[in-house]
Amino acid sequence: MVSMEEKIKACVLQALESAAGTKGEGVYLVSVRVKGAGKQTKIEILLDSDTGIRIDQCSFFSRRIRELLENEGGTPVLDGEDFDLMVSSPGLGEPLLMPRQYLRHTGRLLRVIWKDEQQSEKTVTGRLQQVLKTEGEITAVRLVPVKTGKKSAGNVQEPIELMLDCIVRAVPEAEL
């Protein structure tokens, strides 16, 4: 049996595919979250693009996704249920969930938790210097660690390379 989340994801992917040649071209799905049930159902859809998603693109997809959810092929995905739909971009503090999101964050500060060879979790805050590809696939990132605090001035760190499959969580950090 197909879960409600999978049905919603299928509708989102259909909306994205049908956006070719429109202002929605180049937008991709980051995540779908369904919270609550019945009249309390909240659907949160995060979309992004390689250049960042605009508000008008979010509203465009919100309308299209709602139409599909309410009447997909004559059969509503959410059969007569009330639901709140939120379509937005991943905000600051949202973890990077897809490899292609790293490309857009090149040059930005990230807080990364990864596992070393002994499977111990390590944490580093660093500037994403480069996204590394193997055979066209994003496989690793190069970070330049930064020290925070008063004693960090003039302290240059060596870049580190982290394989994507070792990264547990990577979150863009605010720079003040």
UniProtKB/Swiss-Prot annotation:
Cell compartment(s), UniProt: Cytoplasm
Keywords: Cytoplasm, Ribosome biogenesis
Pfam families: RimP_N
Disulfide bonds: none
Keyword Cytoplasm: yes
Role: Required for maturation of 30S ribosomal subunits.
PANTHER family found in the cross-reference section: RIBOSOME MATURATION FACTOR RIMP (PTHR33867:SF1)
Protein name: Ribosome maturation factor RimP
Organism, scientific name: Chlorobium limicola (strain DSM 245 / NBRC 103803 / 6330)
Lineage: Bacteria, Pseudomonadati, Chlorobiota, Chlorobiia, Chlorobiales
Gene expressing this chain: rimP
